[in-house]
């Protein structure tokens, strides 16, 4: 099947909602970083906040490339901000996990390994383009020309329908796209590695912060990482297997969920930490 044509306003609204979610999440994470009352550590929230802002900037570039310039490239300048977003998120989640001095049981290690293997398999399969058998057209049946048969007539050339020319992208954008295209395979593999690390770190985060008063905010962060993984895997699958795919499909809503869940987690952490500090003062 081919990509479904979506109205321009729909794609703009989708990008707008993603940007609002990640921008709000970034500001709330930075508020936690600036606050001395945060229990889980300020550096943790600095890293996650940098990840949110990196995604915000990368998505801004990608939206301008796709909607503003009408280019659907394999690599865009936004990719050079999406990749640091993985690094910052992984760094922040790792610091949060290490602060718990995690001691997993054999069953928990088994769950972690199983999810890692499944995450690798899903990410690799989603990125690999499918090769359907029906792509090859069957050979045309021809009849031999006999002496009694009329001579084969040359094909009649029909004048092609005049189509509206697509909007021409600026020369600098086309030149930049041509320079970045050779890096497409490398960046695709970086996304696979980033997605796998993200889902493993999210699982570890759930195991580390399953109970306790301050665990709720980190469960939201873990679910945010899972949402990011789902949206990213879908996008890799769609761009590799759906011809003329346009962004804005329903699974991409998980990117919006991801930003919203980080914002909720950061707000909960701030609320619980400031209440804890106020309670100590009254005590």
Predicted features and spans:
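Polytopic alpha-helical membrane-helix bundles and their juxtamembrane interface segments
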Residues: 1-283
